Amino acid sequence: EITTRLVGSEMCIRDRAMPYIRKFSGETIVVKYGGNAMINDKLKSAVMSDIALMRLVGVNVVLVHGGGPEINAMLKAVGKESKFENGMRVTDDETIDIVQMVLAGKVNKNLVQLMEKHGGKAIGLCGLDGNMLMAEKLVTSADLGYVGEIKEVNPEPLQNVINNGYIPIVATVASGYDGNVYLSLIHISEPTRRVVIS
C-alpha cells in the first residue's frame, strides 16, 4: 500500500510537470543565483539538484552567480572592511582582485563540483572568458570603483558549452570596454526567460 501511494504520488508530480517540460524543453533559461541563497548548504544542494534535473529533461540552463558573503569573508580574512553605498559594494583596486579570486575561483568551482555531485555536467566560466560579459563603469552619486553594468553579452562561449551537453556556471566578473575588470550588476531582461534565486 505504501509503495502504491509513493508510485501514485510520483506519477501525480510527473503529470503536473509534463506541460512545463514540454513547454520549456529546448529553451534556454538563465538562473540568477545570489550569494545570500548559497549560505544554507541544504538549499544550495536542492538548487543544484533541480538545475541538473532541468537539464536532464531538455531545458538548457545558464547559472549566473554572485557570492557576496564569500567576498565579505575573504575581505575580513585579509583585514579589509567591506564597504557599501546604497546596497552596492564599493570596489577599489584591492577589492576587485579579491572579488575576481573569490567569484571566478572558489565560489564558481565549488558550484561546478556540487553540480557534478548531483548528476549535472557543468563548466565554470566568468564574464572575462571570451569577453562574454562586457561592462561599463556604473556611474552613481558615489564612486563605487570597479562596479560595472553589463552592456553586451557574447553568447558564443555559452552556446558552445550548452551544445556540448554542459551547464555553464558563470561568475559575475566582466570585461570593461576600458580594459578594466568589473564586478558586474546582472539585470536579466526579456526575451531571456529567467529564474531569480536571491
Positions of PLM-derived features:
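Single conserved hydrophobic/aromatic residue that forms the stacking wall/gate
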Residues: 1-8, 186-197
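Active-site loops and adjacent core secondary-structure elements that bind or stabilize anionic groups
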Residues: 11-12
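Metabolite-binding pocket within alpha/beta catalytic cores that recognizes anionic/polar moieties
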Residues: 23-118
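Catalytic-site beta-strand/loop segments enriched in glycine and acidic/polar residues
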Residues: 32, 161-185
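Short, active-site-adjacent cap segments at secondary-structure transitions
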Residues: 37-39, 69-72, 130-134, 176, ...
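Charged helix-capping and loop-helix junction motifs
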Residues: 44-49, 183-189
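Ligand-binding beta-strand-loop-alpha-helix segment within the catalytic cores
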Residues: 76-167
